[in-house]
Structures are given as structure tokens and as C-alpha cells.
Amino acid sequence: MNTTTLIELTAPQAVNGRRAAYQSLWLLVRLYHAARYEAATEVVRLAELRQQFTDARSLRMFISRAFRDFSRWGIQVGWGEDADSDPRFLNPDRRSQGPFWLPPAEADKIACVVDGAAATREDLLRFLNIRSKPVPAEAAGMPMPADFWMRYALAQQNLRQGQLLATMAEHAGADRNPGALAGFKDAARMAVSRSQHALAALGEAQVWRRLDDLEAARKTLSRLRRLLKEAGPDEGGYLDAMEQILTAWCAYSQRDVALTEALLAAMRDIEPRASVVRYHPRIRFEWHNLMALVRRAHALNDRNSPVRQQAASESMAHFASALDAAFEIGSFDAAQQVAANVGMATWLFASEGLVPGTDAMGARPEALRWLLLSEWLSQRSGTSGQSAWNAIYLMRIARGHCDAGERPSLPAFRAQQPLQPADMAGYLDASADFRIGMPPVSDWLSLADRLLSAQQQGDSRYSLLQRCGCRLEHAWYATHAGELGPASRSLATLAAEIAGLPPSDKAFFQGMLRRFPAEVS
């Protein structure tokens, strides 16, 4: 154990034999109690300080004075939502916003005594008057503040529209939109209950995952788990299930299919999560959509498996259940995700010979109809408009029958004949109402240019895998059109970006790079 900081709890309170300010000492003992006996919580929030010190003229001044005392006593206290951070590197400008926590190594330095004898937990509780903790939100009085819900709703809308980070106005350099990440963090600072803190943490974790920052996503999910443990059996199950779903998504994003499947299987088989998966339509959508992707991975990657066709069939069954749940909750955004996945899976399974009596060309009409349905839903879902995945999938399927081999000559490459956007009209005889889903472009290169321009101008933000997909399609259609300069630049960018992909995804793109003529490679 490190050098001990001795705290005498009886009046006059003292630290290492010297008189100590009561408020500063109270906060340190409260943090010590949280670290020692409240492992599921660990943090002390501003709401508790306001409840305990109602006559404090300025909470900011109180906190500043307390941290000066902590420094004088040789104790480092942390602040912010990430209790795993090193307090030495935290930004002091955000300190007054809390919450506060005591690292385990710092807690080991402290010894609390009562009249010189070691203090028990009951002694600590009596000193802290812990019964004066804030009333739970469920029993809070009126008026109920709207601040949290206003910030949270805006952050949710930004998340749905793909506005993950702050965007700048075209003039005057002012923020046009704080973005979903900042919005959920702001909402967390305004939260007045465990459930609100948990909702904000869930939203933040979703943003980090979509930003491809899986480490930050996992840290935020760890914070969410602590909040859920504190809530105990009162939590209805949705947040706990979503924490598991996001944890599984983080594993899938790194193509750890075995871990993803294990997490999902545990949710399905073990109560109380099994009941949430069964009866909560949003969780049922998330679970089946991700499990469908897992089974799709088995069907496409386990080439020596005798049950590939069964895995493909199971994947489609899970997609069907996910689509049922998406429409049950009335979410066009959820439904368009499933429709896009079904369209691509339909074509991929047929391409691999996993659909009896159907090859890639035979499956193409139905695959395209699913993708156009997805785009129609996307344009009506209140999100940011055209789906990048739908565009990438359409362009890939349109050239799917083209195969000039590795390192083809430029004339041979350009002689290939991909399906053109205008050719899709023949697939829509029974779906005239869904023509809006067709991209309003005359050729695929224009669509690829539009996607890249939206990314470069900050109008859309794509994941790393989406960026690589866009670059590949742009390079293919630019080469086909004879625009070798833009094609070469896209291939160079693609070659650099694939370094951040999981090995299986990287291998796919490396194989595709070898299928371009030397003039652009």
C-alpha cells in the first residue's frame, strides 16, 4: 500500500493531523466510499452535491476549493464519465461538470479513523449522512426539467441523419450543428436520473461505433454497464439488451464472428434477456438483423463447410424476422437496413451457388428490387437521404457479371458491359410506385462521384468500410470510362485506407486491386 492519508472523521475533522475543510473532506470521503463499496457506480454526480450542500453559494467554487485541498493532501481525484481515465491528463476546464471518482490506487492511500480507530462502513455512512442522497427520479417532485430530453431528442435526430460530429456554418465560422456525439455528451451532463444517464451513454456508444472508434465504444459501454448495475432489477431490460447488442456489433465490426454469435446466443438462451429478445420488437429487430449477418458470414466464408446452404437459408430466415420487427415498430430506417441486406445476400448467395436452380444472373432482378425498395424506404425514413450502402451494392451488382481476370489489358477491361441504370426499368414492372428508389443518374460513375463529393464536402460521413467500397466502385467505373487519372487516385486512396480494415475485409479489397489494368494500378 502507498503512503497513507489519515482522515479523522470526528470533529474537528483532520487530514494527517491538520484541520480540514468539512465540504472538501466530505467529498473525499464520499468518493472513498463509492470506490470501496459501490463498485457498480464508482462516481459521485453533481446532483448529489447539490442535495447535500443546498446552501453552497457556488458549486463551482466548492469544487475548485475541494480539488485544491485534494492536491494538498496528495490525492488525485478524477472527473468525467470515463472512470478508467488517468486524472493527470484530464482537462480541468470540464472539471466542475463532474461526475467525480477516485481511482483504486488513490483509494488505497486513504485510511479513515474515528477517534483513532479504523472506521467501519457504518461510520462512513453516519459521517456522510448518506440518507440525504438525492431522491430517485421516479419520486422527484415537479416541475420535471425538459433540458435533458431536448438535448437527447436533438442528438437522436442527428444520429438518425448521420450527423455524428459537429459541422461548421459556411460563414462566420459558427457551429451549424453540434452533432450527435456532442449532443449525447451534453444530454449526459443534464441527466437527473440513472435511466437518463444510461440513455445518453447508449447513444454515445452508438455514435462511437459508427465512427469506427471501437475502443471508445467499448469504454462507453463499460460505463453503461455500471449504470445498469446500479439500476438493478428496476431497469426494464431494453438498455441492458441494447448494451449487449452493441457489444456484439463491436465484435462483428472486427469480424470476430465467433464472439458475435456467442453473445447473441447467450441473449437468446438466458433469462431475462431471452424474454426481451422475444417480446421487445426493437431488440428483436436488432438481434435478428445481426444474427442474419453472422449466418451470412458462415455461408460465404466457410467454403469447406457442408452446411453452407443451410447457413444461407438461416440467414434469410433471420432477415425475414428482422423485417417483421422493423415494420412492427413502424421504422422505415430499420426496414431499409434489412431490405438492403436481403438484396445483397440474395445476389451473393446465388453467386456462390447456394440457391438451388439460380445463379447470379438469375438472382439479379430480385436482388435489385430489394435494393430499390431499401432506397425508397431510406428516402422516406427521415434520415439523411440516399443510402451509401444501397449505392455501393447497386454498382457492385451491376458489374457483377464482368470478369476480365487479374491484370487485364485496358482494352479488355473497358470492353466489359455492366448493367446501366436505365436498364433497371425492366425490373420494376410490378413496382412502379417504387421508381423513386432508382438513382437519378445516367451512369454509375456519376453516382460514385456524387458519393465521394458528399464525403469530401462533409455532407455525409461514411464508415471506413463504406469509404473503401465507394473508392473501389469509383475506380472501376472511372477505369471503364477511360478516366484513368481519377481512377488511379481512387485506387491509391483505397490501397492506403484498407490498412485499417479487419484481415478478411482487407483481403477482399487486395484481391480486387489486382483486377485493374496496369495503367491505373
Which functions belong to the PLM regions below?
Residues 1-182:
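Intrinsically disordered, low-complexity protein-interaction/activation regions
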Residues 1-9, 16, 20-22, 56, ...:
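C-terminal non-catalytic interaction modules
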Residues 129-139, 166-185, 209-228, 254-274, ...:
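Helix-turn-helix repeat elements of alpha-solenoid scaffolds
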Residues 144-148, 184-197, 226-238, 269-284, ...:
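Flexible helix-coil transition and linker loops at the boundaries of alpha-helical arrays
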Residues 150, 157, 176, 192-193, ...:
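Short coil/turn linker motifs that delimit alpha-helical repeat modules in TPR/alpha-solenoid proteins
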Residues 155-173, 199-213, 239-256, 283-304, ...:
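Tandem amphipathic alpha-helical repeat scaffolds
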Residues 319-323, 327-458, 467:
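Eukaryotic tandem repeat interaction scaffolds
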